UniProtKB/Swiss-Prot annotation:
It is found in: Secreted, Extracellular space, Apoplast. This is Laccase-10. It comes from Arabidopsis thaliana. NCBIfam families: laccase (TIGR03389). The lineage of its organism: Eukaryota, Viridiplantae, Streptophyta, Embryophyta, Tracheophyta. Glycans are attached at N76, N112, N185, N296, N323, N373, N383, N400, N441, N545.
């Protein structure tokens, strides 16, 4: 019983904080295959410790976490600790060929990092190939000793992980797509804590049940681990109070629908204030680009009030329509940093590096792509499709290796056009391994501009090594003179993954106070595969704690 054990561990941490403050937390992740049946189909999947989803990591703020990852499968493996700042410990960040070479079959690597200045819901996942479809789990960071939540303490906490499921092997799915030059097949189901819920013409194979008691409040730690789709999340007859996103507290607000993009986390309180019974939990996709294919199936689970007979009919709900842009915007526009004395919003007011990055698709020639009419769909930032190196970029930077990358990533698009209007006739991109160099402690603004090339689309952009403030969002083309005057520099939401709206833009700001090489990419796995990614190289500072630490002795070799 995975979740009761997690709850006991959580209670133990809360009950004995003096024993765990600044403690060392040790975990072993055995990466193994397991035969699993979902939607009346059985296949082998890659897992951690034979669990899907994988085990939850529990820690307090200031704890040091050591995870020994042992690779027992045929694939190369790496694990990313999504949202952990990794201050000066980039060797533990995890993206393959960016901060480390992957762990080869039969080998192991100990990820060693300290949780500094963070508390809340984060998650971990594989960061190579498409393995994160099944190799993922939660990270729960509890506040440090003597520091309560800035909201009423819930009766219980529950991790809820949303994902996708393919009947076919996911590596086969992506490899076939790359050979054809076309988009991969969409998933066959969405899942809630590993289960799709009701599936027509398929007998029930178990589903997730959230057990509650009338009159009590529960904290849901919600994670979108789906590969390619933003999701709406609802519970029939209940409303949420959102209190945190991406492990940063927000001004609480009430909603009946949560929007969560791949890579994002949302923590919300829900009160069991309805009449006893069973209530449907639903997760379904949001996609307001009419030409982009999605898996339109709804994953379901159940809220079960104590004392309710299992045969009691479940009260139902319907998620918003797939193209419910107004619902999505209402949720996103409600997010504000707490900006209190204890949790200030330290937004950079002045900017040293003002960057405009276009994010979108392109089409390159491909002589072997017969199914794609000898063309391949690609993705790019500022028209550069990122070329993955064969040596880890952080290693190349630290040891001054040459010929691996260049530091001339453009600050602005080299080709200016009506980004959200009619696409240019030439949709080809440049393929290169280019980084953008930042001096230590410099302030950065990045405007992420979607393009209509091939198709406008939402892009959940994730930045490793930093949190950032979302100071502005808009539709159409970004206008630096008009739109910057409307920026929120007082209490903008702080997070690590931002949803760039379809046919629009998002403006983020952060301080480059973490030396190393830090990946930035779309968290739609198909777009990352196609090349929508780049990296920042943050130089060492001059102070004693402003340089990246030496690499560990067991760092994997390429």
């Amino acid at each position: 019983m995975v979740f009761p054990i997690r709850i006991l561990v959580l209670f133990a941490l809360l009950a004995f904080p003096a024993c765990v403050h600044g403690a060392i937390r040790k975990y072993t992740f055995n990466v193994v295959t397991k035969q699993v049946t979902r939607i009346c189909s059985t296949k082998q999947i890659v897992t951690v410790n034979g669990k899907f989803p994988g085990p939850t990591i529990y820690a307090n703020e200031d704890d040091t976490i050591l995870v020994n990852v042992v690779n027992n499968v045929k694939y190369n493996v790496s694990i990313h600790w999504h949202g952990i700042r990794q201050l000066r410990t980039g060797w533990a960040d995890g993206p393959a060929y960016i901060t480390q070479c992957p762990i080869k079959p039969g080998h192991s690597y100990v990820y060693n990092f300290t949780v500094t200045g963070q508390r809340g819901t984060l998650w971990w996942h594989a960061h190579v190939l498409w393995l994160r479809a099944t190799v993922h789990g939660a990270i729960v960071i509890l506040p440090k000793l003597g520091l309560p939540y800035p909201f009423p303490k819930p009766h219980r906490e529950e991790v809820i992980i949303l994902g996708e499921w393919w009947k076919s092997d996911t590596e086969t799915v992506v490899n076939e797509a790359l050979k054809s030059g076309l988009a991969p097949n969409v998933s066959d189901a969405h899942v809630i804590n590993g289960h799709p819920g009701f599936v027509p013409n398929c007998p029930s194979q178990g589903n997730f049940k959230l057990a509650v008691e009338s009159g009590k409040t529960y904290m849901l730690r919600l994670i979108n681990a789906a590969l390619n789709e933003e999701l709406f999340f609802k519970i029939a007859g209940h409303r949420f109070t959102v209190v945190e996103v991406d492990a940063v507290y927000v001004k609480p607000f009430n909603t009946d629908t949560i929007l969560i993009a791949p890579g994002q986390t949302t923590t919300a309180l829900v009160s069991a204030a309805r009449p006893s019974g069973q209530y449907l939990i639903a997760a379904a996709p949001f996609q307001d680009s009419a030409v982009v294919a999605v898996d339109n199936r709804t994953a379901t689970a159940t809220v079960h009030y104590s004392g309710t007979l299992s045969a009691t009919p479940t009260k139902t709900t319907s998620p918003p329509p797939q193209n419910a842009t107004s619902v999505a915007n209402t949720f996103v526009n409600s997010l504000r940093s707490l900006n209190s004395k204890t949790y200030p919003a330290n937004v950079p007011i002045t900017v040293d590096h003002d960057l405009l990055f276009t994010v979108g698709l392109g089409i390159n020639r491909c002589h072997s792509c017969k199914a794609g009419n000898f063309s391949r769909v690609v993705a790019a930032i500022n028209n550069i499709t990122f070329k993955m190196p064969k040596t880890a970029l952080l290693q190349a930077h630290y040891f001054n290796l040459t010929g691996i990358y260049t530091t001339d990533f453009p600050a602005k698009p080299r080709r200016v056009f009506d980004f959200t209007g009619k696409p240019p006739s030439n949709l080809a991109t440049m393929k290169a391994t280019k980084l953008y160099k930042l001096p230590y402690n410099s302030t950065v603004q990045v405007v992420l501009q979607d393009t209509g090339n091939v198709a406008p689309e939402n892009h959940p952009i994730h930045l490793h090594g930093f949190n950032f403030f979302v100071v502005g969002l808009g539709t159409g083309n970004y206008n630096s003179k008009k739109d910057s005057n409307k920026f929120n520099l007082v209490d903008p939401v702080e997070r690590n993954t931002v949803g760039v709206p379809s046919g629009g833009w998002a403006a983020i700001r952060f301080r480059a106070d973490n030396p190393g090489v830090w990946f930035m990419h779309c968290h739609l796995e198909v777009h990352t595969t196609w090349g929508l990614k780049m990296a920042f190289l943050v130089e060492n500072g001059k102070g004693p704690n402003q340089s990246i630490r030496p690499p560990p002795s067991d760092l994997p070799k390429c």
